[in-house]
A protein has these predicted regions:
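Active-site beta->alpha N-cap acidic-glycine motif
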Residues: 1-38
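Hydrophobic faces of well-ordered beta-strands that scaffold small-molecule active sites
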Residues: 3-5, 43-49, 88-92, 113-115, ...
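The substrate-binding groove and active-site-proximal loops of carbohydrate-active enzymes
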Residues: 11-24, 57-67, 86-93, 169-172, ...
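Acidic, His- and aromatic-enriched active-site or binding-groove loops in soluble protein domains
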Residues: 26-38, 44, 68-72, 76, ...
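Secondary-structure boundary elements
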Residues: 38-41, 65-87, 97-100, 107-115, ...
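Active-site-adjacent pocket scaffolds in enzyme catalytic domains
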Residues: 81-85, 91-192
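C-terminal domain-boundary segment and adjacent tail
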Residues: 113-114, 180-184, 190-260
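C-terminal beta-sandwich/jelly-roll accessory domains of carbohydrate-active enzymes
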Residues: 244-282
């Protein structure tokens, strides 16, 4: 199988009772090292972000991206400056997108694995009901990527980025089932562009749950023998499903003229403005 590692920076917290790995690049560097090994060379490295809770505790959840901290900008800016890296794919912390994160992603990141629309949303525990952590009640419950609406990320619209459905394994809600996998194969049999994706967390032993998914794929393949599928990392999965052409690498030219910074691009950029990172002397 091929894996996509969505790496988070645990930074800016005042308490860390569960001893999470703190610091910029700590998790990112670990998985880059693994990817560079022969066994994981086909894996993908992508971006994950946990909004800062009011408590500033590393084990608490939050959904608001701006106002409580600048860790989102810090994390991305340091990836550019320290690692010469910027993401093209994203999965949101706590599966939650809101208008603030929706419009931020629309400027900079084209592939968004956040849609968790699921039949079980009508029967969630009280702490997860009413879209508390990830409101996907109006979103499409199929496996085709979609462009969201400007004012409602759950509906199809004319935004540039693509949102993919990505269900859970190994947890207590929005679980990927055999029915979901069969649905993906049925859609593929109907010649629809399908990206079947699921998510887990590396602080657990993921192997039993991933083996369960593999068995579900085998079962679906027996039901739909004409459907071909392949394991793929996140970026390539979207590109291949939608037949998105590979573009040449962007080349930027920076100049300072009359105390003004000018940035020229060799190709059109994804969003309306570039993400500019600056490192100061202090």
């Amino acid at each position: 199988m091929v894996y996509s590692w969505f790496c988070v920076d645990h930074v800016g917290y005042e308490s860390n009772p569960r001893n999470r790995e703190l610091g910029f690049h700590k998790i990112f560097d670990r998985y880059v090292e693994l990817k560079n090994s022969k066994k994981s060379s086909s894996d993908g490295i992508h971006f994950h972000y946990h909004p800062m809770p009011f408590s500033r505790s590393a084990h608490h959840c939050a959904t608001k991206y701006f106002g409580s901290s600048d860790t989102l900008y810090q994390s991305l800016a340091r990836k550019i400056i320290d690692r010469s890296w910027f993401p093209c794919a994203f999965r949101p912390g706590f599966n939650a997108i809101r208008p603030d994160s929706h419009w931020f992603l629309e400027q900079f990141i084209p592939f968004d694995f956040s849609n968790q629309a699921h039949i079980s949303d009508t029967d969630l525990a009280p702490d997860l009901s009413s879209g508390r952590f990830g409101d996907w009640r109006r979103a499409q419950k199929n496996w085709q990527p979609y462009h969201p609406d400007h004012n409602d990320y759950q509906l199809q619209g004319n935004c540039k980025r693509l949102i993919m459905r990505c269900l859970n394994i190994g947890t207590r809600h929005r679980l990927l089932t055999q029915t979901d996998v069969d649905q993906a194969f049925l859609e593929a049999e109907s010649k629809k562009p399908v990206v079947l994706s699921f998510t887990h967390h590396d602080f657990r032993d993921m192997r039993p749950d991933i083996e369960l998914v593999r068995k579900m794929l085998i079962n679906a393949k027996e039901k739909f023998p004409k459907v071909r599928f392949k394991y793929s990392e996140a970026r390539n999965a979207v590109r291949e499903a939608l037949a998105i052409n590979y573009e040449p690498a962007i080349k930027l030219n920076l100049n300072i003229r009359e105390n003004k910074l000018f940035v020229d691009s060799s190709v059109p950029t994804f969003g309306p403005q570039p993400f500019l990172a600056i490192k100061t002397n202090n």
